[in-house]
Amino acid sequence: MKRVSLLLSILAGLAVAGVLASALGAAEPPAAIPDGVTIGGVPVGGLTPEAAVSAVQQGFETPLEIQLRSTRILVTPDILGATPVVDKAIERALIAEPNSVIPLGVSVVPGAPAAFIAKLAKRYDRPAVDAKLFLRQLRPWLSKERAGLKLDRRTAVHDVATAVATGVRTGITLTQTTMRPKVTRANFGPVIVIRRKSNKLFLYNGMHYRRLFLVATGQHQYPTPLGRFSIVVKWKNPWWYPPDSPWAAGQDPVPPGPGNPLGTRWMGLSSPGVGIHGTPSDGSIGYSVSHGCIRMHIPQAEWLFNHVEIGTTVFIVAS
């Protein structure tokens, strides 16, 4: 009987000890990350997993600092579609040696960095602006051209995506290429201004006066049209074909050569049937006697032909 009582006492003692041991084990603090360990550049040594998650998440959310010319831009990783893979990094950190460097995995939504860069380009890029031609006080005037700016998108997407994935947050500089305008005040070509009332043709290079010619313009019944036109065709030694007009009724085409009403050169304008040409009728120059075209002395028409191009602007004004 005494043996049974002793055995029961021992078993009861062991049970109490087991309960105490379990209670003590449950009360043990959670494991800490070894000293000196970093995750993605964030020190987490000595922290609990929960505290380490918070520290790594906070560090990852530091905005990227982007420099675009004189503009400083801050953007958080979530805007770039980036999410840190923290759990796996914490698991590695818990079993790492002290002072270990643990990389932080980053998941990036495909296309998100490119979409962000596209928005930057839309806001900060600007197209090149060509010089524009106007007529002011009977003279050609050109607006000032302006260079454009174009973001190097491919490099920008690569640099931003790499930075957000590797933990870099500063020193990200994006570049814009200067886009030169095609048409400038300096390279603008010839411009013609015809003053119908005074029967004068002025040739300019851009805004700069070059030469003056006396011409013949249309008579009252067949006035030379007013407006802005361009040279659309240039012919050497042209044929003359009678137009569909009462004054040319019954006339036959005239081949190139002496007596051709168009002389040796034809510079057709964007106004149908109207052009600048030579004439064998030198006595008509200086008067309003044509059927709408602009006549010139043949040698002068040949010279002008060589100094204008298809597309040259022709202003015809009443003055």
Q: Where are the regions a protein language model picked out?
A:
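Short, surface-exposed linear segments at secondary-structure transitions and domain or protein termini
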Residues: 80-91, 219-229, 287
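Exported/periplasmic cell-wall-interacting domains
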Residues: 32, 162, 166, 244-319
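N-terminal export and membrane-targeting signals
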Residues: 1-15
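Sec-dependent signal peptide cleavage junction
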Residues: 22-30
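Envelope-exposed proteins and targeting segments
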Residues: 33-40, 60-64, 71, 129, ...
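Gly/Pro-biased beta-strand-loop elements
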Residues: 184-280
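Short glycine/threonine-rich beta-strand-turn micro-motifs
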Residues: 30-192, 199
